């Protein structure tokens, strides 16, 4: 499948009706031991943790959206990464969307983030704390040139390279999605230490943030992991294919109906949503 077709599918997956989904009616985590259920784009979570809003190492954006819930492993990853960044004097980590209290489908903006194992992290590390008003209406910093072929040199900082590398080297991280131009710059800057680049995957948009995904926890028996990324650093022909012009004659795919929920997620909805 060519890149244009994939882009259209991704857009359709994330641009669903803005009407509230049943999952948004669940306002608190479902009690129980933490269990991520299903796949990243069709699942839910029992026993989600709430990311503490107050931290000296990170700040949470758009708290009015209440998307700061996730598996305990995700909360610990955010705390671990932000502590590393702070100890290195790099700045404050800005946390975007995680998931809803019970996971599940959003009414727009995300196709994944459903099992409590995904988090968006802005690719900027401010030295001064954001105000409450700034956190509610954050300003994204677009690091990619208008033609999409490279990063903006005046905006690309060594600290951003280090932030992505630190996240990729974490034991629980399985994938990090960034814009192809950002992946290309990481490949140029990486030097001889390149093993971590395998986890960094090029994807549409993601010009101002990275989307970090954790592996399924060992005790979440109903969680469906993705296959591992292909071997290698991903800096060769695969990456360059993202910069090729779309093939002529690409047609817009039909909008697909969401697949049935995993039985455990459907049972959760039946029990907790009237």
Curated annotation (Swiss-Prot):
GO terms for biological process: peptidoglycan metabolic process; proteolysis. Its EC number is 3.4.24.-. Keywords: Disulfide bond, Hydrolase, Metal-binding, Metalloprotease, Periplasm, Protease, Signal, Zinc. It is an enzyme of class 3 (hydrolase). Disulfide bonds join 44-265, 187-235, 216-223. Pfam families: Peptidase_M74. Residues 1-19 form the signal peptide. Zn(2+) 1 binds at residues 110, 113, 120, 211. InterPro entries: Hedgehog_sig/DD-Pept_Zn-bd_sf (IPR009045), Peptidase_M74 (IPR005073). GO terms for cellular component: outer membrane-bounded periplasmic space. SUPFAM superfamilies: Hedgehog/DD-peptidase. Its cofactor is Zn(2+). Transmembrane segments: none annotated. It is found in: Periplasm. Zn(2+) 2 binds at residues 147, 150. Gene3D superfamilies: 3.30.1380.10. Dimer. Belongs to the peptidase M74 family. Murein endopeptidase that cleaves the D-alanyl-meso-2,6-diamino-pimelyl amide bond that connects peptidoglycan strands. Likely plays a role in the removal of murein from the sacculus. This is Penicillin-insensitive murein endopeptidase. It comes from Escherichia coli O157:H7.
């Amino acid at each position: 499948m060519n890149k244009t077709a994939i882009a259209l599918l991704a857009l359709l997956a994330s641009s669903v009706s803005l009407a509230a989904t049943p999952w948004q009616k669940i306002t608190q985590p479902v009690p129980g031991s933490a269990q991520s259920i299903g796949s990243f784009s069709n699942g839910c979570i029992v026993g989600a943790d709430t990311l503490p809003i107050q931290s000296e190492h990170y700040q949470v954006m758009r708290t009015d959206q209440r998307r700061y819930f996730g598996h305990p492993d995700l909360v610990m990853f955010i705390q671990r990464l932000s502590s590393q960044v702070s100890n290195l004097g790099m700045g404050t980590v800005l946390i975007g969307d995680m998931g809803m209290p019970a996971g599940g489908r959003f009414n727009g903006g995300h196709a994944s983030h459903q099992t409590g194992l995904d988090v968006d992290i802005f690719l900027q590390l401010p030295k001064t704390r954001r105000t409450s008003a700034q956190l509610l209406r954050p300003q994204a910093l677009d690091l990619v040139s208008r033609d999409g072929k490279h990063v903006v040199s005046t905006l690309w900082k060594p600290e951003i390279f280090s932030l992505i590398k630190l996240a990729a080297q974490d034991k629980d991280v399985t994938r990090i999605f960034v814009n192809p131009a950002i992946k290309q710059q990481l490949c140029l800057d990486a030097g001889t230490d390149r093993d971590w680049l395998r986890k960094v995957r090029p994807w549409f948009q993601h010009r101002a943030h990275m989307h970090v995904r954790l592996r399924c926890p060992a005790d979440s028996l109903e969680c469906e992991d993705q296959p591992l990324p292909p071997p290698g650093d991903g800096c060769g022909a695969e990456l360059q294919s993202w910069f090729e012009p779309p093939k002529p004659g690409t047609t817009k795919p039909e909008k697909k109906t969401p697949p049935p929920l995993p039985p455990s997620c459907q049972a959760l909805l039946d029990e907790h949503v009237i």
